[in-house]
Amino acid sequence: MSKVSEKQQNKRTNILDAAYELFIEKSFNNTSIDDVVKSAGIAKGTFYLYFKDKHDLMERIIIRKSALILRYVLEELMKKKETCKMTFSEQMLFITEKIVDYLEEHTEIITLMGKNFSSCLNYFSTIEDDELKSMLSELVHENIENGFSEQETLKRIYLIVTLVGSVCYDSFVFESPFKISEIKPLLFKSVE
């Protein structure tokens, strides 16, 4: 990466980090672009070099955070698979459990993301994390070897991630219609 590219990436990351902290602290609606640029220590025009508006910024934060969570979960899955062979169903249950555990420990993330946890899958081609792409690709290809098509596998992963994200959002943010302790057994059974 060239010095200019690295500097631009650092500036973009700085804006994302500053906005994330402000959105957590003050909420999305109560944070202005002026708040973000002040916190990031940049000029307002610089903000618009990287993002169209506050909604674009929020979308990028959600993609980034959901990709980070997914990466963590898939890294844990890869470690587990080193010690034992797992079916696709077992892998999906493991992923579900890890996502629930992670979001339970970091409820501020799901509060901010809402029911948009699967965003990183919607924008998979824009994710800059090659290792995450590689782990997802490995998961997909393992399932292809078990007789499922690539599209069917991607759809299954999407459905599971969307289901888990939505259930976690309702359970952690509203504790309604069910607390996570009440719904988790049925969630796992649904994924299975």
Where are these regions (language model features)?
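Amphipathic alpha-helical segments used for helix-helix packing
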Residues: F94-Y123, Y169-V173
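Hydrophobic/aromatic-rich alpha-helical bundle segments in the mid-to-C-terminal region
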Residues: T111-G114, N143-K189
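Short hydrophobic/aromatic patch on the recognition helix
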Residues: G41-F51
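Hydrophobic alpha-helical connector segments
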Residues: R60, E75-E104, I160
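Alpha-helical DNA-contacting segments of helix-turn-helix folds
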Residues: M58-K65, Y72, M113
